[in-house]
């Protein structure tokens, strides 16, 4: 980064903080680039900041993933207090960065849109303006992999980034940018589209929650999240059984996300977590599948 004494590739040891359960593609990226992935628990209001504060004292820790709103897979929304603590904390590495991936910023399942924290302003106020790389896109709004991406950070970081981005390519697809602008028209236009998204997928989430509660609620053999937005439900089963539940479901013709996939290296030490993704299948398939999962 622009605050680094040398490229990270020349460092002897590199570490990256990963809140868990979290997003497997995030973990795959940092693993591919040679980082040792260290985990912290994801709580209802964001990552366990006390655990983060201890880890970042190590100068080998160069960064951290954060999905601040409707996090994958728990649906957690970070509190302003935790955001400020992440911005304020002392890091052993002067070039420590937080990738603030706001992929689900407007992906509500209700009529309400939570406030989007002004994380760059918070970073400035807390004395670490270069700490955050804020990102988002319309991949889960318009076209998967072919929407419009966003990158926000400090002016110093942007200057450094543009020096490198200018080598990679002349510029983004401005026709696609214009098409998105014309389609949405305004921020309220985005919210209107996302309310329509919610109308399509909310019944599927309700079905999952209803079946889990009906089939498993009284037995205390599982816990699950009740997200207000995002695309996933996080299911925790009895410790040591998640892979077996996944296998039984597979044998019954139900394809779930691999148990442990929400953890770095696919290793859930407690073997308890399964990420449920009900958005794609038709309603009747979601209900049939969840009835089968509850049986497993």
Task: Locate the predicted segments by residue.
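Hydrophobic "anchor" residues on beta-strands that sit immediately upstream
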Residues: 63, 97, 133
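Walker B catalytic acidic pair
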Residues: 102
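PLP-dependent enzyme catalytic core of the Aspartate aminotransferase-like
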Residues: 128, 251-252, 265-296
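Short hydrophobic/aromatic beta-strand micro-patches
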Residues: 152, 234-236, 277-279
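Conserved glycine-rich beta-strand-loop-beta hairpin in the small C-terminal domain of fold type I
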Residues: 195-209, 221-236, 250
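Helix N-cap motif at beta-to-alpha junctions
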Residues: 238-241, 281-283
């Amino acid at each position: 980064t622009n605050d680094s004494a040398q490229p990270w590739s020349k460092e002897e040891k590199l570490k990256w903080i990963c809140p868990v359960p979290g997003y497997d593609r995030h973990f795959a990226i940092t693993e591919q680039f040679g980082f040792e992935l260290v985990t912290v628990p994801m709580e209802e209001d964001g990552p366990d900041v006390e655990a983060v504060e201890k880890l970042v004292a190590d100068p080998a820790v160069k960064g951290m993933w954060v999905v601040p709103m409707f996090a994958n897979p728990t649906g957690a929304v970070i509190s302003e207090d935790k955001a400020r603590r992440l911005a304020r904390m002392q890091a052993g590495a002067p070039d420590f960065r937080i990738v603030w991936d706001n992929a689900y910023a407007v992906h509500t399942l209700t009529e309400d849109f939570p406030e989007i924290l002004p994380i760059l302003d918070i970073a400035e106020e807390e004395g670490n303006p270069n700490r955050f790389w804020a990102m988002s896109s319309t991949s889960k709004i318009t076209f998967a992999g072919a929407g419009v991406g966003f990158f926000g950070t400090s002016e110093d970081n942007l200057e450094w980034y543009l020096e490198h981005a200018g080598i990679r390519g002349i510029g983004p697809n401005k026709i696609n940018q214009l098409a998105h602008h014309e389609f949405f028209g305004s921020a309220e236009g985005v919210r209107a589209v996302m309310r329509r998204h919610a109308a399509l997928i909310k019944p599927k989430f309700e079905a999952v929650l209803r079946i889990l509660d009906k089939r498993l609620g009284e037995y205390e053999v599982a816990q699950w999240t009740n997200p207000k937005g995002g695309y996933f439900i996080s299911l925790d089963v009895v410790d040591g059984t998640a892979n077996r539940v996944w296998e039984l479901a597979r044998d019954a013709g139900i394809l779930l996300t691999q148990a442990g996939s929400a953890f770095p290296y696919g290793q859930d030490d407690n073997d308890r977590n399964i990420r449920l993704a009900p958005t794609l299948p038709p309603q009747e398939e979601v209900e049939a599948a969840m009835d089968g999962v509850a049986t497993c």
